[in-house]
Amino acid sequence: MDWKRSLKEKLRRDGYVRKSEQEMKEEEMSLFTNYYTEWKGGGKVSSAQNIPRFYYRLPAEDEVLQQKLREESRAVFLQRKSRELLDNEELQNLWFLLDKHQSPPLIGEEAMINYTNFQTVGEKAGEKCKTFFTSKVFSKLIPNDPYGRISIMQFFNYVMRKVWLHQTRIGLSLYDVAGQGYLRESDLENYILELIPTLPQLDGLEKSFYSFYVCTAVRKFFFFLDPLRTGKIKIQDILACSFLDDLLELRDEDLSKESQESNWFSAPSALRVYGQYLNLDKDHNGMLSKEELSRYGTGTLTCVFLDRVFQECLTYDGEMDYKTYLDFVLALENRKEPAALQYIFKLLDIENKGSLNVFSLNFFFRAIQEQMKIHGQEAVSFQDVKDEIFDMVKPKDPLRITLQDLIQSSQGDTVCSILIDLNGFWTYENREVLVANDGESPPDIDDT
């Protein structure tokens, strides 16, 4: 059979016309464009249909079925994530494997492991451990070891920390009602309330005090992690800060007295803050007036500053509740922190311009001068103090000081103390004497 003749006959019957080279190139390009567009998900559709979905509406309060479905699906997801974590038995097995594959020579008492043995342990440890046995993790932990090894203890602590972070994230996510990766105030309150029975250092707290303790603990999280006062905190931010570590430190039954006193979440600290509030509340109505708050600390906060506190902060019939008082205490006890400086700066910014000028500084310092006269102290020139403040802060604009200037100067706490607290100003004025008598406790203004 003559195939050549048969094919020509077939093409003739089908009406085939031989195309030029240019036509063939155009056809090829057209086919390529169509196939490529189809493969990329394109086509003759509007661009809006190609935008991936990025908003998922949360079920409304009356959509009970959708809410239940969402809760159940999240619970199943979190349970699956929890099962993917190493349990105590698996962690113990990992430790045995690491100890078994130590890499000589032994230097001191520190057990080390090289990269070859590190990979061997990773293969034997199981599927759950694979994420820890990567070259990236090894290079992160490698010290100045002449043999290119890492510390077994350091690596194991790294694994333990990672597992703890994931466990804690899952635990916090259970209280994330919206499922959006953040906790509202009520969510965090529920978390801490259910955490109290697991913290031996809080065993002595009366149940009647639980609500005040929870309020005290939650305020620290929101004061520092929610500076814009949105009413919610990212779970990621909670894990990244040290507050949760401080809170869970209360699991230690042998926690020293010094550690408890310096820990905001400890029972002694919470009772101290609440006790101060009760002592200030002379009329026992559960709220603080400006006159009652004026006795806070050493009683040397200026009237002008206290006026600003009650103008700017949330009050009820001109009086301050416990939650607002906690923000006030956190700001004054942590004046070096940006969140505390932001709180105080807002009170100092009487013109609401986002900066402090000479007028603002003079407005507050006049109250300091008046208090000095009352205590029989020698008057101090505002010009001298103003020049010292600008020299300390070194603002970008020589005529005004912004919040960012205060934070970057690392002198924000000193500047704030000079302007709002007579005792703070006196401490600054006599700093050279205090340094000379470093071993002695500084006297109050009344002692001078």
Swiss-Prot record:
Q: Which UniProt keywords apply?
A: Calcium, Cytoplasm, Metal-binding, Nucleus, Repeat
Name any Gene Ontology BP term.
regulation of dephosphorylation
* Organism of origin: Xenopus tropicalis
Q: What is the protein name for this chain? A: Serine/threonine-protein phosphatase 2A regulatory subunit B'' subunit gamma
Where is the EF-hand domain positioned along the sequence? 268-303, 336-371
Asked if the Swiss-Prot or TrEMBL record annotates the protein with the keyword Transmembrane helix, the reply is no
Molecular function in Gene Ontology: metal ion binding
InterPro entries, per the entry = EF-hand-dom_pair, EF-hand_13, EF_Hand_1_Ca_BS, PPP2R3C
Task: Establish whether keyword Hydrolase is in the entry.
Answer: no
Q: Name any GO cellular component annotation.
A: nucleus
Assign the protein's first listed, main location to one coarse class: nucleus
Localization recorded for this chain is:
Nucleus; Cytoplasm
Q: What does this protein do?
A: Possible role in the regulation of cell death.
PANTHER family in the cross-refs: SERINE/THREONINE-PROTEIN PHOSPHATASE 2A REGULATORY SUBUNIT B'' SUBUNIT GAMMA (PTHR12085), SERINE_THREONINE-PROTEIN PHOSPHATASE 2A REGULATORY SUBUNIT B'' SUBUNIT GAMMA (PTHR12085:SF3)
Residues recorded as binding Ca(2+), renumbered to this chain, are: 281, 283, 285, 287, 292
Classify the source by domain of life. Eukaryota
